[in-house]
Amino acid sequence: MALTMTLKEELARVPVAATPERRAETAAMLRFAGGLHLVAGRVVVEAELDHGASVRRLRAAITELYGLAPEIVVVSGGNLRRGQRYVLRVVRGGEDLARQTGLIDQRGRPVRGLAPALVSGTTAATAAVWRGALLAHGSLTEPGRSAALEVTTPGPEAALALVGAARRLHVAAKAREVRQSDRVVVRDGEAIATLLAAVGAEQTATLWRERRERKEVRATANRLANFDDANLRRSAQAAVMAGAKVERALEILGDEVPDHLRYAGRLRLEHKQASLDELGRLADPPMTKDAVAGRIRRLLAMADKRAAERGIPGTDAASEG
């Protein structure tokens, strides 16, 4: 929870001058934190957030972009909920706001995913969509085996749209249903840091990387303390050589690497001291150690074949250097 609040605190302060990006962020916040209600025949837009600065940012954007005056109601946490919740409502002009932000179409019908304009915008607008989604319903957990950057979505259509937006930012995300709730999850360590930086959370990205590195160092120290010194040296040397070969293979192949082989290679590079068995457990979804070893072998073989065709040093050159 601490990292989530740190992230939202930083995102709520990200300056955005361009109107298209502000509109994209606002629309995303309303989509992922909001809902539509009919009150006495009028459309009311409502959004519920757990962070004061975020709801104030949303209110300011709605006022400045659309000339409307949202009201904010503070709801104290009860037995099942910790902390305060902030409910933003737009009653007067709610239908116009819903239409302009893509919550309903021109005929007044609810839009289930994200409006086409949000999905096909510029890179900056795409980052704004993710920033809005994180402010609305995002969470960031501590580095470790269960580390994740996650957004709870109102439905599968919005989840798939957010996955597509992540892809445009060169980040692999997955849509999942967890306890009857649709979510978008980013688990790869480097991908999490990349996405955090893309949405403007540079300080949180740095903090997350530092904690991740410290955790890996501690885990490595704890694991290696159980080994005999000679075995330790041999294991460490083998891991360094394997990592160097994989790095050389990815360099040789560039964009030609199949996704499943690239994933195995990135696992090896991100966890250089881990055994194949541990790499398999770290994979998402988990793999056997034989499956991990097989993918890495195929990656190296593919790279060596391509290196031979191009007349350049293969993967063995990395370990020799």
Curated annotation (Swiss-Prot):
Residues 275-308 bind DNA. The keyword Cell cycle applies. Transmembrane segments: none annotated. GO terms for biological process: cell division; regulation of sporulation. Signal peptide: none annotated. Keywords: Cell cycle, Cell division, DNA-binding. InterPro entries: Homing_endonucl (IPR027434), Sporu_reg_WhiA_N_dom (IPR018478), Sporulation_regulator_WhiA (IPR003802), Sporulation_regulator_WhiA_C (IPR023054), WhiA_LAGLIDADG_dom (IPR039518). It comes from the Bacteria. The keyword tRNA processing does not apply. One of its GO terms (molecular function) is DNA binding. Pfam families: HTH_WhiA, LAGLIDADG_WhiA, WhiA_N. NCBIfam families: DNA_bind_WhiA. Involved in cell division and chromosome segregation. Belongs to the WhiA family. This is Probable cell division protein WhiA. The lineage of its organism: Bacteria, Bacillati, Actinomycetota, Actinomycetes, Micrococcales.
